[in-house]
Amino acid sequence: MPSSSGVDSTQELLDAQAHIWNHIFNHINSMTLKWAVQLGIPDIIHKHDKPMTLSQLADAIPINRAKSDALHRIMRILVHSKFFDRVRTLPNEEEAYCLTRASRLLLRDEPLSLTPFALAVLDEDLMGTFHCVPEWFGNECPSPLEFKHEKSIREFAENNQRWSLLFNEGMANDARLVGSILAKESRKVFEGLETMVDVGGGTGMVSKAIVDAFPGMKGIVLDLPYVVSGLKGSGNLRYVGGDMFHSVPPADAVFLKWILHNWSDDECIKILEKCKEAITTSKNMKGGKVIIVDMILGYEKQQDEAVETQLFFDMMMMTTLTGKERTEQEWAKIFFAAGFKTYKIYPLLGLRSLIEVFP
């Protein structure tokens, strides 16, 4: 009977081999998704307004007809990955492809589209940083991206306008989703607040949704001067150029969406200390709160795919920035180190949670 170290039976040996093979080829899931959006397949099927056969899809892309079999094989794995479904209305009819909930989130005109984010994350230069991790462990560079490209993620973005536009569009689309959910599902978190600062809020997409839902609230979007330059506020929303490491405008609450996971523990503590100053110098003398939207690793029991996705995000933070995804214990450690006393967790954003932190 075949055997290997720690493997006692033929089936266990074959299972171990299959497990390794799966991980060797796992990048193909990401690449077939990238090909689908680059070829515009979700949009083509959507505009057709009914399921499309392989031949119809090949004509619409269009592709060299000699490569129709390759398209069929790509669609087969995308169906397996649940990005498309196959349907047949009549027994002798050719199978046709239709959209799923996942592929509807890849439509270019969908306000919540994940296509820009997918293309930014799967960028060839960005993905190249993963090949440098073993060498990176032996040097002083803060991230594999900086080791490979000799520039920070900000410099990488400044020198790659196409990538920067994709990433910013992806973040704006995500902000639409988060803003709409928070305005509907977590009203008690924002009720009673007169002022809120959205730190690193970019164009203010989330802040707009929140202040629109709470007309009595005044919102401030704090971001770097070049980010907010030219942005015009409204009656209850204004933009301020600044640096969260230096100061945060006084307010009843400070809002941080997907900010802290970009930074190391020490950097997060510095940011949170500035947030604490802002909420304790507000006219609300009792002290306000900090509202965080971020991932919490291992919080509550989750499906394997959700856990794996959170761990993937953690690796993305490690390879491109100095940040990390954190467990509840790791979050608590930086909260208390920054001078906060208590916190509450609301797991209402899928892989992410809302955390209220109190001084």
UniProtKB/Swiss-Prot annotation:
Active site: 261 (proton acceptor)
Biotechnology: Nevadensin is a selective inhibitor of human carboxylesterase 1 (hCE-1), a key enzyme responsible for the hydrolysis of a wide range of endogenous and xenobiotic esters.
Reactions catalysed, as given in the entry: an 8-hydroxyflavone + S-adenosyl-L-methionine = an 8-methoxyflavone + S-adenosyl-L-homocysteine + H(+); 4',7,8-trihydroxyflavone + S-adenosyl-L-methionine = 4',7-dihydroxy-8-methoxyflavone + S-adenosyl-L-homocysteine + H(+); 7,8-dihydroxyflavone + S-adenosyl-L-methionine = 7-hydroxy-8-methoxyflavone + S-adenosyl-L-homocysteine + H(+); 3',4',7,8-tetrahydroxyflavone + S-adenosyl-L-methionine = 3',4,7-trihydroxy-8-methoxyflavone + S-adenosyl-L-homocysteine + H(+)
Tissue specificity comment: Expressed in leaves and trichomes, especially in cv. SD and cv. EMX-1, but barely in cv. MC and cv. SW.
Transmembrane portions of the chain: none
A Pfam match: Methyltransf_2
Signal sequence interval, chain numbering: none
Record-listed S-adenosyl-L-methionine binding positions: 223
Annotated metabolic or biological route of this protein: Flavonoid metabolism
Entry keyword set: Methyltransferase, S-adenosyl-L-methionine, Transferase
Protein EC: 2.1.1.-
GO-annotated molecular function: O-methyltransferase activity; protein dimerization activity
Record GO biological process: methylation
PROSITE patterns: SAM_OMT_II (PS51683)
Regulation of protein activity: Strongly inhibited by gardenin B (GARD B).
Superkingdom of the source species: Eukaryota
Keyword Ribonucleoprotein: no
Family: Belongs to the class I-like SAM-binding methyltransferase superfamily. Cation-independent O-methyltransferase family.
Functional note: Cation-independent flavonoid 8-O-methyltransferase involved in the biosynthesis of polymethoxylated flavonoids natural products such as nevadensin and salvigenin, aroma compounds which contribute to the flavor of sweet basil, and exhibit pharmacological activities such as anti-allergic, anti-oxidant, antibacterial, anti-proliferative, and anti-inflammatory effects. Catalyzes S-adenosylmethionine-dependent regioselective 8-O-methylation of flavonoids; mediates likely the conversion of pilosin (PIL) to nevadensin (NEV) and of 8-hydroxysalvigenin (8-OH-SALV) to gardenin B (GARD B).
Official protein name in the record: Flavonoid 8-O-methyltransferase 1
Organism: Ocimum basilicum (Sweet basil)
